[in-house]
Amino acid sequence: RISGGISSRKSKRKSGGEAELVSGPFPVRGGSFKIWEGGPMDAYLLLENGAEFHGCFIGPERELISEIVFNTSMSGYLELVTDPSYTGQAVVLSYPLIGNYGVCREDMESERPLLSALLVRELSELESNWHSEGNLRDFLIRYDIPGISGLDTRAVIKQLREHGTMNGLISGRHYEGEEREALLRRIRDYRVRDAVRRAGRKEISEFPPSG
């Protein structure tokens, strides 16, 4: 929902307070974020122009700022999630149901996903595919990629089409007042950094020809 449509359901969080706001989509493991227990937990996407959308977390539940982009593919979500060109970006998928055929390592475009988050309308809890090796939710958790399900992705994409690529905050909190304005300034100032270094190979790999 756009700002104003906030769920009344209470979020369940681990005792110890709210997550830290990290400076970008690549927090240091074990130190700069907290995982909340219980679920599904409320999640919010706050765009730099002030538009806000509500859903529920899938994968790790934490707070981050990222560049927000969209993709209109009807299939191939695992190829998209592992496409290194999305390094440091949160990707909104326009197709309404994601995850229904599971995940398979053979479909991966790189060794691991490098996008900062995955944002979908509905995540399928069941996968039906003889080729599947697991479900998308577990895949995101394994690789520490947060996401949101239940978003009005058409409305988000409409914002991006009208205003161009924008930054956004993914959070388990709804911010208001001065705190919100300070966050919006921080969101607008965010830039993706070190994308080439993160996506590039650290060592030479050889792919022997076959067939």
What are these regions (language model features)?
Residues 32, 40:
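Cysteine-centered metal-binding/redox modules
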